[in-house]
Structures are given as structure tokens and as C-alpha cells.
Regions:
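Class I SAM-dependent methyltransferase SAM-binding "motif I" and its flanking Rossmann-like core
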Residues: 1-64
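A contiguous loop/helix-start segment that scaffolds small-molecule binding in enzyme catalytic cores
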Residues: 63-161
Length: 161
């Protein structure tokens, strides 16, 4: 984007594309199997996207049946975005909705936590939530089974076992 806007040529830049695993998928795997069917990712960083747009996106997806991966939930300078996100989610989702938190995925300080939507706003001041954290918000079918988040695909009602 910057190269193009400055009149540069892509041929002048030597680069290599290395396929990877998105943070939401990596974090979802650490939590169990919460990201099946439809999933939406929303960043709470307002450095390049105005908070009004972020709120509008949250308002659009919160009442739907998506699981939601939230990136960049908290920074030292930007705390109110996380609180506003929690308010919007609580307007549209059950307070008992399972929440998975992964701090520092694949790093030495990796930490995971399962909680519920009602408790999530209280965790904003805790060390587990910062810019290296990904939060997975379950949908109306998500549940916790043996310390794992599970969003069923519906096989148990479709097939006779």
C-alpha cells in the first residue's frame, strides 16, 4: 500500500511469502474447538480504524451466531475500547457465554483462561489481557467441556450414531 502510494514498483522489492496459522486459529486450538462454522475477527485497535467503525462492526456481529475472535483488546493508552466492546457484547449475548482468553500464544509467557462474558469486563485490569491477547467469544451453542471450549457443528443431530 505504501509502496504503491509513493510510486514504487513491486518488482523492486524482494520478499518471500511464508504461510502461517492465523492467531485466532492458533488460540482456538489452545482453548479446545470453539471456532467452527462461522467466525468473525475484530480488532479493537483504533490506530488506523476509528472507534466508531469498530463499534459499528461489533454491533453488527454481536447479535448474530458467530464466534468472535477479538484482537488487540487492551493497551496502556487505550482501555475504553475494551470496556465498550464488553458493553456491546453484553447487550446482545447471554452473560454466561463462554469466553476463552489466550495471552502470548506460542511465547514463553503463554497463559490461557476460560471465563464467561459477565466476568470479562473485570479482567481488563489484569495482566492476562493486553496487546498480545486474543479473546474468543463463544456463540449461543458454545459450551465448556472438561476445561475446553466447544462450539458444536451439529453432527449429533444430523447423524444417527
Amino acid at each position: 500500500e505504501i509502496l504503491e502510494s509513493k510510486g514504487g514498483s513491486a518488482e523492486a522489492v524482494d520478499f518471500e511469502v511464508v504461510p502461517g496459522v492465523p492467531a485466532a486459529q492458533s488460540c482456538g486450538a489452545r482453548l479446545g474447538a470453539p471456532l467452527v462454522n462461522d467466525t468473525v475477527s475484530v480488532s479493537l485497535s483504533d490506530h488506523l480504524t476509528p472507534m466508531e467503525e469498530i463499534e459499528s462492526r461489533l454491533e453488527a456481529v454481536a447479535p448474530e451466531g458467530f464466534t468472535i475472535a477479538i484482537y488487540n483488546p487492551w493497551s496502556r493508552k487505550r482501555r475504553e475500547n475494551f470496556q465498550r466492546c464488553c458493553e456491546i457484547l453484553l447487550e446482545h449475548r447471554d452473560p454466561d457465554t463462554p469466553i476463552g482468553i489466550v495471552h502470548g500464544a506460542s511465547r514463553d509467557d503463554e497463559e490461557t483462561m476460560l471465563t464467561d462474558l459477565e466476568t470479562l469486563p473485570e479482567l481488563g485490569e489484569e495482566d492476562i489481557i493486553d496487546m498480545t491477547t486474543t479473546i474468543i467469544v463463544g456463540n449461543e451453542d458454545t459450551y465448556v467441556f472438561e476445561d475446553r471450549m466447544v462450539t458444536p457443528r451439529g453432527y449429533e443431530t444430523k447423524y444417527d450414531y
